Curated annotation (Swiss-Prot):
It comes from Gallus gallus (Chicken). Keywords: Actin-binding, Coiled coil, Wnt signaling pathway. This is Disheveled-associated activator of morphogenesis 2. InterPro entries: ARM-like, ARM-type_fold, DAD_dom, FH2_Formin, FH2_Formin_sf, FH3_dom, Formin_Homology, GBD/FH3_dom. The keyword Coiled coil applies. Residues 437-517 form a coiled coil.
Length: 1075
């Protein structure tokens, strides 16, 4: 497609936005022009230009018109400005100065015309309303147009067009409504709004059906102008397709050609309509896609030629109208140029497009020796086979073929259609790509399928290798950690062993010396290490106190075997002296003989202030004095808190005188239907079917599964969940016996039977499978248990160490003793469960305030550090979720599993291994690492138990009666309530501050209004009327309040000068097509 350079002046008459000359500024008014005697002098040039610029901006003029306006002399500018302002301030025009009025009236007109027909007087009145709107859209400031758009005035006009009856459509009202849309489109913002509306152009095109000639002309001018707007050309073509359906046309543009050809009655001499139609046709042909696309112009022009436009053009020449003739000349001129350009492609001067034989010869000549020629023959051959009837029936197949060819010619490389008339959503480019080479595509498809399978297989292998690598890496890291810990432990124990050996050698030397009769002085031995050396050292120490000791054998050289135990002391030896440590004493000094008891020691009597009147009671659980010793309550002195607490305020606040069921979705068992073949099956049918389902998921042969189990799945073929499922299908003894009876028919066995038979041949298959599953599951189980143990340990430490918690309990104890009397009062401590009862005590003054809220207010005032208590107790939420019984049960299960693996490992070490069996080396490494990791978990659990027991004792709670989830849950719930109460107080403060701010603002506004009222009253009459109006007008103009209702009312009440203003109007009409 070769673009054709064209003289842009040839399209000049199509443009609806003016020519190249500067426009002439015309002033229109209903009254004749007269000179005005302005009382307000012309302002300085700078101020005048600023005001005039605001006025010109409101008019939304084109650049050329703006230049012409600014080129006016200052006196003319000031005259235009004052005239426009006078018009805006006219009291008679205020009601119609906003589009709301017009939109409401037109909506009511649309509703009323469906109820009854208008008489002539009503029609005239309605037409005047629409005409006034048209004038307002042309002459009112830009804000009027924007307000009209914001109020969806366009939809109001379009709805009127859609709903009007026949009489209205033939009346002047129809013409005026189209004129309103035309006026709106003369504004840049309005034009963009109309084009953006999805149905506007379609609805406008429906007005072509009227018999009103003026309406037809206005519609054609709009459609012709839209063709010249970016993205407008395609909308016009779509609108003509819409009109074809709306008007039941046989083909597109049929109505236009009929109107162009009509020469009877009032249409005989109606040159304006025919001129408008021809200008529209030229715009459709030469704008948009037709500007540079020869194929599009030929395509669309052929559509008009098929409708018979050429004889109509010849007939239109009889009118001898210069303007119409220019349109006709332009149509034929462009047609001749396009025909010549098409002929040049075939090296001809002219192509007779009416001759089928000539066109066929040209196509045949061009394609004769090309690869496309066979397809031309195929097309012709299939055309011969198309259905044929003498009466012209079955023409739709030919029509479809024609439209497909049209689409092929018109659609560009991007797949965009300049005209959707032939076939919508028909992408030629994609179809051509599909038909490039069917054999090649099939070959590529087969090759792609092969690549896809290879890719899937490689991805499967890669995933398997990645799993294997990840597992090996984890095992290596775990083994390195364990090895480092073992090295540290070995160095520590080697040092302890060396010290114990040195000590033992010293003792042996001393014994030898003693046996020779010397006196022995024993130095104080160092604290013995744990384990064997401790027992030996203790035994020797107690043996030294007896007589007639037999000589000890010489010390053995260091070896991995433990030394033999020392001989027991002879009977009859003296008993150990009083106060001597027991045999396995760890050197801990004996407990003090001073014991705490209520009889032995007395707690200092508390001097608690007494309230002036009864208070609400705090429902706590008081600890007995016997249980105070050794707890946190020993360190708390609530009497110190009374020194800083405001007890009087507290009395006012708390006076006694006031008031999953988890929905189990029904699970359906899945059964796979298997082919009924003659195969041997001795296993239970349902069990065999489930086994087949599992094997199909594994995607491994029996031999691959067997090798994976023998090699302990070093290549990670078996996932944890698959191993768990395999454990459900371990061959039972009854299954094995039955399968053994038919082992000679192994080839006929069903898949499940053969699998179970082959697995039963593996020695200790079940134990191997269980050991492998335990090995894979061990890191996960350890990772789940360890954080729970750590949570209990850390939470216990945090509770014991928290200083903020100690302070909080001190204040709560003080308030509780102040509130409670009798048996509930004078407490030295309370149970921790009482913390969650603090929020149950509500204030007598404000029911929204609880004792917990009050405590937080006290903390904010006197103990601000307590407010951050949660930072000291970060592990409480996790610890509150731990069930110690379940945790210990899980740890014991892990321990049992480890013992079972060790037992199986011992068995496998004793038997002769078959080739490829990797159980012993793999599980030996695993047991080494797992045993050490588990011992760490056990030690951590023991530490957590001890710390938890200390925490219970620290708070005076009974050991064994409260589980961690309950104990830590109490504190966790309290901290949550604490945080919620803090947020409540914050919200209350914000609400109170907002109310106070609002009250202050109202008071300030009231005071300001009163002040302004007094000032106005004081200054009344002091300023001249003219000066006040001038200042108010300038201020309102600059602030954009010039059209405010209050200001307008103010100006109407003032006396104005009797000057007549000049009115400017901005007639931005669509230029008629002319030269």
């Amino acid at each position: 497609m070769a673009p054709r350079k064209r003289n842009r002046h040839a399209l000049g008459f199509l443009c609806c936005f003016g020519g190249s000359d500067l426009p002439e500024i015309n002033l229109k008014d209903n009254n004749p022009l007269q000179f005005l005697d302005f009382t307000v002098p012309i302002p300085p040039t700078e101020e005048l230009n600023a005001r005039f610029s605001e006025l010109v901006d409101e008019l939304d003029l084109t650049d050329k018109n703006r230049e012409a306006m600014f080129a006016l002399p200052p006196e003319k500018k000031w005259q235009i400005y004052c005239s426009k302002k006078k018009e805006q301030e006219d009291p008679n025009k205020l009601a119609t100065s906003w589009p709301d009025y017009y939109i409401d009236r037109i909506n009511s007109m649309a509703a009323m015309q469906t109820l009854y027909a208008f008489d002539e007087e009503e029609t005239e009145m309605k037409n005047k309303i629409v005409e006034d709107l048209k004038t307002a859209l042309r002459t009112q400031p830009m804000r009027f147009v924007m307000r009209f758009i914001e109020l969806d005035g366009l939809s109001c006009l379009l709805n009127f067009l859609k709903s009007m009856d026949y009489e209205t459509s033939e009346s002047r009202i129809h013409t005026s409504v189209i004129g309103c849309i035309k006026a709106l489109m003369n504004n840049s913002q309005g034009r963009a709004h109309v084009l953006a509306h999805p149905e506007s152009i379609n609805i406008i095109s429906q007005s072509l059906r009227t018999e009103n000639i003026k309406t037809k002309i206005a519609v054609l001018e709009i459609l012709g102008a839209v063709c010249l707007v970016p993205d407008g050309h395609k909308k016009v073509l779509q609108a003509m397709l819409h009109y074809q359906v709306y008007a039941a046309e046989r083909t597109r543009f049929q109505t236009l050609l009929n109107e162009l050809d009509r020469s009877m009655g009032r249409y005989r001499d109606e040159v304006n309509l025919k001129t408008a139609i021809m200008s529209f046709i030229n715009a459709v042909l030469n704008a948009g896609a037709g500007e540079d696309n020869l194929e599009f112009r030929l395509h669309l022009r052929y559509e008009f030629l098929m409708l018979g436009i050429q004889p109509v053009i010849d007939k239109l020449r009889e009118h001898e109208n210069a303007t119409l003739d220019r349109h006709l000349d332009f149509f034929e001129m462009v047609r001749n140029e396009d025909d010549l350009e098409l002929a040049k492609r075939f090296d001809l001067i002219h192509i007779d497009t009416k001759s089928a034989s000539q066109m066929f010869e040209l196509i045949k000549k061009r394609l004769k020796h090309t690869d496309a020629y066979p397809y031309l023959l195929s097309i012709l051959q299939h055309c011969l086979q198309m259905p044929y009837k003498r009466n012209g029936g079955n023409f739709q197949q030919w029509q479809l073929l024609d439209r497909i060819l049209q689409q092929i010619v018109l659609q560009d490389e991007r797949g965009d259609d300049p005209d959707i008339a032939p076939l919508e959503n028909f992408n030629v480019k994609n179809i051509i790509k599909m038909l490039v080479n069917e054999n090649e595509v099939k070959q590529w498809r087969d090759q792609a399928e092969k690549f896809r399978k290879d890719h899937a297989e490689l991805m499967s292998k890669l995933e398997k290798k990645e799993r294997e690598c990840e597992t090996k890496t984890q095992e290596k890291d775990e083994m390195m950690k364990t090895l480092n810990k073992m090295k540290d432990k070995l160095q520590k124990e080697s040092l302890e062993l060396r010290q114990a050996r040195d000590q033992m050698n010293d003792l042996v030397a001393q014994l030898n010396e003693y046996s020779q009769g010397g006196s022995i002085s024993f130095p104080a031995p160092p604290p013995p290490p744990p384990g064997g050396p401790l027992a030996l050292s203790s035994a020797l120490s107690s043996a030294l106190t007896s007589e007639n000791l037999p000589p000890l054998p010489p010390p053995l050289p260091f070896s991995s075997c433990p030394p033999p135990p020392a001989p027991p002391p002879p009977p009859g030896g003296p008993p150990p002296p009083p106060g001597a440590p027991p045999f396995f004493s760890l050197g801990v000094p004996p407990p003090s003989t001073t014991t705490f008891s209520s009889a032995g020691t007395s707690l200092k009597k508390k001097s608690i202030p007494q309230p002036s009147h009864p208070l609400k009671s705090f429902n706590w659980a008081k600890l007995s004095e016997e249980r105070i010793h050794g707890t946190i309550w020993n360190e708390i002195d609530d009497l110190k808190a009374f020194k800083v607490l405001d007890l009087e305020d507290f009395e006012k606040m708390f006076s006694a005188y006031q008031r999953h069921q988890k929905e189990m979705g029904s699970t359906e068992d899945l059964y796979l239907s298997t082919r009924k073949v003659k195969e041997l099956s001795v296993i239970d049918g349902r069990r065999a079917q489930n086994c087949v389902i599992l094997l199909s998921k594994l995607k491994l042969s029996n031999e691959e599964i067997r090798q994976a189990i023998l090699k302990m799945d070093e290549q990670e073929d078996l996932a944890k969940d698959m191993l768990e499922q395999l454990l459900k299908f371990v061959p039972e003894k009854s299954d094995t016996d039955l399968l053994e009876e038919h082992k000679h028919e192994i080839e006929r066995m069903a898949r499940a039977d053969r699998f179970l038979f082959e697995m039963s041949r593996i020695d200790h298959y079940q134990q191997r499978l269980q050991a492998l599953f335990f090995k894979k599951k061990f890191p996960e189980r350890l990772a789940e248990a360890k954080p729970k143990v750590e949570a209990i340990l850390l939470a216990s430490k945090e509770l014991i160490r928290s200083k903020r918690l100690r302070q909080l309990l001190e204040v709560v104890l003080a308030f509780g003793n102040y509130m409670n009397k009798g048996q509930r009062g004078s407490a030295y401590g309370f149970k921790v469960s009482s913390l969650n009862k603090i929020a149950d005590t509500k204030s007598s003054i404000d029911r929204n305030i609880t004792l917990l809220h009050y405590l937080i207010m006290i903390f904010e005032k006197n103990y601000p550090d307590i407010l951050d208590i949660q930072t000291e107790l970060q592990h409480l939420p996790e610890a509150a979720k731990v069930n110690l019984v379940e945790l210990e049960k899980e740890v014991n299960n892990i321990k049992t599993g480890l013992k079972a693996v060790e037992a199986e490992l011992d068995y496998q070490k004793r038997r002769i291994r078959e080739s490829g069996d990797r159980f012993v080396p793999v599980m030996s490494d695993f047991i080494t690492v797992a045993s050490f990791s588990f011992s760490e978990l056990e030690d951590l659990l023991n530490d957590a138990r001890d710390k938890y027991a200390k925490a219970l004792k620290h708070f005076g709670e009974n050991e064994g009666k409260m589980q961690p989830d309950e104990f830590f849950g109490i504190f966790d719930t309290f901290l949550q309530s604490f945080a919620e109460a803090k947020q409540d107080l914050e919200n209350m403060r914000k609400k109170k501050e907002e109310e106070e701010r609002r009250a202050r603002m109202e008071a300030m506004l009231k005071e300001q209004r009163e002040k302004e009222r007094r000032q106005k009253k004081a200054k009344a009459g002091s300023i001249s009327e003219e000066t006040g109006e001038f200042d108010d007008l300038v201020s309102a103009l600059r602030s954009g309040e010039v059209f405010d209702k209050d200001l307008s009312k103010l100006k109407r009440n003032r006396k104005r000068s009797g000057n007549q203003g000049l009115e400017t109007s901005r007639e931005r009409v669509v230029t008629k097509l002319n030269y």
